[in-house]
C-alpha cells in the first residue's frame, strides 16, 4: 500500500515487528545510519536516524512510546523523553524529534522535555492541530508532535485527511537554515 511513496522517497528503513510497534521510515535524503533503540521498554522501539541534508548531518529521533492504560504509570514516557533531551543537549547539529508522544503539548512532561532539550515547537501560536481522534473529530487531541532545533525554519503545517488510522496524518514542512 505504501509502495507509491518509494518514487519520491527512495531512502527507506523498515523495522518490522510482530507487535503493534513496527516502524517504517521514508526519506528524500540519504540516510547515513539508523539505530533501533529501546529506551525504556524492550518491546517499544524508537529510531534515531542520521541523514545528509545538503551536506549537513541532521539527527532525527522517531519516537512512539506505548500508550498509557488506565492506572498505568507514565514513567516510561517521561524517561524516554528525558533520555532524548539529554542527548540533544550534548550534540551540536540540527535535530528533530517527531512522533506520537501519547501526550498533549501542554502537559508538564512535554513542556519539560522541550525546555531541557532546547527545542522549538512549530505549532506554538498557530493552533492545536489535533492529530488523534480521526474517527471522532469532536474528541480529537494533539498527541503527535514535531520539535526542532533552531536550525530549522517552519514553512507550513497541515493536518491531512483521515486515511484509515485513528490518527490524522500530519505534514510539517521545514527548511534547514544556512550554517
Predicted regions and their residues:
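Soluble catalytic domains of enzymes that build or remodel membrane lipids, polysaccharides, and related
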Residues: 1-179
Amino acid at each position: 500500500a505504501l509502495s507509491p511513496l518509494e518514487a519520491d522517497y527512495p531512502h527507506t528503513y523498515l523495522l518490522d515487528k510482530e507487535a503493534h510497534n513496527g516502524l517504517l521510515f521514508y526519506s528524500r535524503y540519504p540516510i547515513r545510519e539508523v539505530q533501533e533503540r529501546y529506551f525504556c521498554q524492550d518491546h517499544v522501539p524508537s529510531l534515531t536516524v542520521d541523514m545528509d541534508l545538503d551536506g549537513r548531518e541532521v539527527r532525527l529521533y522517531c519516537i512512539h512510546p506505548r500508550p498509557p492504560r488506565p492506572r498505568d504509570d507514565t514513567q516510561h514516557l517521561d524517561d524516554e523523553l528525558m533520555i532524548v533531551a539529554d542527548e540533544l543537549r550534548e550534540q551540536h547539529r540540527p535535530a528533530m524529534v517527531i512522533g506520537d508522544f501519547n501526550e498533549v503539548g501542554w502537559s508538564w512532561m512535554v513542556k519539560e522535555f522541550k525546555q531541557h532539550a532546547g527545542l522549538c515547537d512549530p505549532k506554538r501560536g498557530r493552533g492545536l492541530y489535533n492529530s488523534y481522534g480521526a474517527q471522532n473529530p469532536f474528541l480529537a487531541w494533539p498527541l503527535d508532535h514535531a520539535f526542532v532545533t533552531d536550525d530549522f525554519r517552519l514553512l507550513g503545517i497541515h493536518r491531512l485527511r483521515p486515511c484509515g488510522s485513528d490518527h490524522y496524518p500530519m505534514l510539517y514542512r521545514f527548511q534547514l537554515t544556512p550554517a
